[in-house]
Amino acid sequence: MDATVIDELQQILPIEQLRSTHASNDYVERPPAPCKQALSSPSLIVQTHKSDWSLATMPTALPRSISQCHQLQPLPQHLSQSSISSSMSQSTTASDQRLLASITPSPSGQSIIRTQPGAGAHPKVDGALKGEAEQSVGHSSDHLFICEECGRCKCVPCTAVRPLPSCWMCNQRCLCSAESLLDYGTCLCCVKGLFYHCSTDDEDNCADEPCSCGPSSCFIRWAAMSLISLFLPCLCCYLPTRGCLHMCQQGYDSLRRPGCRCKRHTNTVCRKISSSSSPFPKAQEKSV
């Protein structure tokens, strides 16, 4: 058993001979360009030194020739393979620590930047000049045709009827408006559903307008509604509630519509563009 241990120990090369062998190995050495890059970055230096030490500590390296095997000196018998490997690992760890200590910069040498430089100050836009520019652009495109009698604009957006406000509810499934509240409050929705299922003509609009006075089966519709009102008395409140809704619509339109509301035909005046702040300035010149 002692003879086999001595033979194995004799096959292990010393570190000096491994370094000389590594220096003459063409397959392990790297080209000069990566070497320069490794010298410039500390992380690559640490990796290359660790690889060199790993190659130096490999116990499975074999001698290149028989002459190198004869040049090995016999080791004492009281040394074991575990003690040799432990001493080599300790020397490797100590050298790695010294290398890392030399590469790591001292905390006093460089200061850590914790705050980023602020962005450059942008020029502030004058609010008054911006408002005047937007106002001049708005006057140049809107309110060009002014009524000669009331002094209001006669364009289509200004003279359009303003409906009562409405909104969508339940993920845009239900329309909440004055018309829908009137239909559900007076049970007219039940009459519409009944006319829709009982109608045989697809083009018949009796389900959409059951209370209209049109010629499309007017007598039958009103007779059916009179019969249904016996079971649904709330249908009798539909016509007066409809009149109140129409009055509310007229009042809201008179307050919200900015355009001309003249009933009779009046002359149209082309307004001269000016920087006046009034929404409807007086006419400056007439159109030819």
Curated annotation (Swiss-Prot):
Biological function: Inhibits neurite branching, arbor length and neurite complexity. Inhibits EGF-mediated p42/44 ERK signaling. Negatively regulates the MAPK cascade, resulting in a reduction of extracellular matrix protein accumulation. May function as an antagonist of fibroblast growth factor (FGF) pathways and may negatively modulate respiratory organogenesis.
Pfam families: Sprouty
Family: Belongs to the sprouty family.
Domain called SPR: residue spans: 154-267
Tissue expression pattern: Expressed in the brain with expression the highest in Purkinje cell bodies and projections in the cerebellum (at protein level). Also expressed in central and peripheral nervous system ganglion cells, superior cervical ganglion and dorsal root ganglion (at protein level). Expressed in the retinal ganglion cell layer and the inner nuclear layer (at protein level).
This protein's name: Protein sprouty homolog 3
Record's subcellular location: Cytoplasm
Top-rank taxon, per record: Eukaryota
Assembly with partners or alone: Interacts with TESK1. Interacts with USP11. Interacts with CAV1 (via C-terminus).
Induction of its expression: By FGF signaling.
Cellular compartments per GO CC: cytoplasm; membrane
Keywords (A to Z) from UniProt: Cytoplasm, Neurogenesis
InterPro entries named in the record: Sprouty, Sprouty_domain
GO biological process: negative regulation of ERK1 and ERK2 cascade; negative regulation of MAPK cascade; negative regulation of neuron projection arborization; nervous system development
